[in-house]
Design a protein with these regions (language model features):
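A structure-centric signal for secondary-structure junctions around beta-strands
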Residues: 17, 29, 45-46, 127, ...
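Active-site-proximal cap/loop segments of hydrolase catalytic domains
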Residues: 69, 74-75, 82-276
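Short hydrophobic segments within beta-strands
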Residues: 35, 51-52, 133, 211
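Non-catalytic accessory segments flanking enzyme active sites
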Residues: 1-44, 61, 68, 75, ...
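Short substrate-entry loop that stabilizes the transition state in hydrolases
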Residues: 40-46, 51-92
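Active-site/binding-pocket entry motifs
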Residues: 6-7, 28, 55-58, 124, ...
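Residues embedded in well-ordered beta-strands
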Residues: 31-33, 79, 209
Length: 276
């Protein structure tokens, strides 16, 4: 069974993944990977797609993955950047706990820093064409980038929260949210006030693709509807795609094909790369 698709994989151009580290402004050692597109030519310029992992207590590693397949995302002609931001697992318990009390701000800064390092060290990346996106906690962070930077031409948010307060009241992760946010919502501590993306809605400007499974109980549909409504209200170019028969993950074959088609179409539109 481990060799079932080996012959098919042999016929696919899968460039080696490039690993790199940098020291963040806060002195933390951050691990990253660059995934290159098939037919990569270092003399050419490629747009950058910053992909943000969920969790937050998981990590990017060199693996074959269905939901966010790195090589499939890179295939139309993108360099894909994967960053194990603060809170990622695999680097010790203390490192994983750094996100408690600071769920979005530092991780968002590290993602931007990683993009800066990638641009500095890889002249084949076109810094004028960058997009960021992720699912679940990666969607949360994509929404935080919406609130805090305009460096990206577009954003992609799958199952991402935009409102910490409504997420607390509808998700199945009440306790974990309180741990990361420093207490229950009614205490209105600094995180609830300062790291809630919707509080910065007046600043939303970046075109965004919002996708969600209608049966999602981890990050329920209401947060995606809230986000899309705000984007429409602010006249930010945006698209909402709801999968009625999917939960937190987009797993069914035809739905997965549509999911990737939507992502590639959005990237092609804003990063000026022909869709494939």
């Amino acid at each position: 069974l481990t060799q079932f698709n080996l012959d098919r994989v042999r016929g696919i151009d899968l460039p080696p993944v490039k690993h790199f580290w940098f020291t963040s402004r806060k002195g933390r050692s951050i691990h990253n990977m660059l995934v290159l597109p098939p037919g990569f030519d270092a003399s050419k310029k490629y747009p950058l797609f910053v992909v943000i992992h969920g969790g937050p207590h998981t990590m990017f590693r060199d693996q074959w993955f269905l939901r966010w397949n790195y090589h499939l995302l890179a295939a139309p002609g993108y360099v894909v950047l994967l960053t194990n931001y603060s809170g990622s697992t695999g680097f010790g318990e203390a490192a994983a706990q750094t996100i408690q009390g600071d769920p979005l701000r530092t991780a968002g800064e590290e993602i931007n820093e990683a993009a800066d390092v990638a641009l500095r060290d890889n002249p084949f990346i076109d810094g004028s064409r960058q997009c960021a996106g992720g699912a679940s906690y990666g969607g949360h962070l994509a929404n935080w980038l919406q609130a805090t930077t305009t460096r990206y031409r577009c954003l992609i948010s799958h199952a991402g929260l935009v409102n910490l307060e409504s997420q607390w009241g509808t998700s199945d992760t009440v306790y974990g949210r309180e741990v990361n946010n420093g207490g229950p919502v009614w205490e209105q501590g600094p995180v609830w006030r300062e790291q809630n993306p919707i509080r910065y809605a007046a600043q939303f400007k970046t075109p965004t693709l919002v996708t969600i499974g209608e049966q999602d109980f981890r990050v329920p549909l209401n947060n995606s509807l809230e986000y899309w409504t705000v984007l429409q209200r602010q006249q930010v170019p945006s698209r909402l795609v709801v999968f009625p028969d999917e939960n937190h993950w987009i797993l069914k074959g035809e739905n997965s094909r549509l999911f990737y088609a939507e992502i590639h179409g959005w990237l092609a539109r804003w990063l000026e790369v022909p869709a494939k």
